[in-house]
């Protein structure tokens, strides 16, 4: 799924560019999506496309990094 948050479903919205002379042309407002590694409840790690609001709210469970000696 491109350009859509995999947690909240946020996707592009439509609006207008408005010039100084008040001419309106269509445009799209894109969500701020980032790719992040997410640990599933089964323990698998998956790269997901999520919005920054979901990242900050803690909806994405980051995988634990194993340190090697």
Swiss-Prot record:
One Gene Ontology biological process: translation
GO cellular component: ribonucleoprotein complex; ribosome
Alphabetized SUPFAM superfamilies for the sequence: L28p-like (SSF143800)
A Gene Ontology molecular function term of the record: structural constituent of ribosome
Keywords, alphabetical: Ribonucleoprotein, Ribosomal protein
Domain of life: Bacteria
One Pfam family hit: Ribosomal_L28
PANTHER family registered for this protein in UniProt: 50S RIBOSOMAL PROTEIN L28, LARGE RIBOSOMAL SUBUNIT PROTEIN BL28A
NCBIfam families assigned to the protein according to its UniProt record, in alphabetical order: L28
Family: Belongs to the bacterial ribosomal protein bL28 family.
Protein name: Large ribosomal subunit protein bL28
Species name: Oleidesulfovibrio alaskensis (strain ATCC BAA-1058 / DSM 17464 / G20)
Gene of this entry: rpmB
């Amino acid at each position: 799924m491109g350009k859509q948050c995999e947690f909240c479903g946020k996707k592009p919205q439509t609006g207008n560019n408005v010039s100084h002379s008040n001419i309106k042309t269509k445009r799209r407002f894109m969500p701020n999506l980032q790719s992040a590694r997410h640990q599933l409840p089964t323990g698998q790690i998956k790269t997901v496309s999520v919005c920054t609001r979901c990242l900050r709210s803690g909806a994405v469970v980051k995988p634990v990094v194993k340190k090697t000696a």
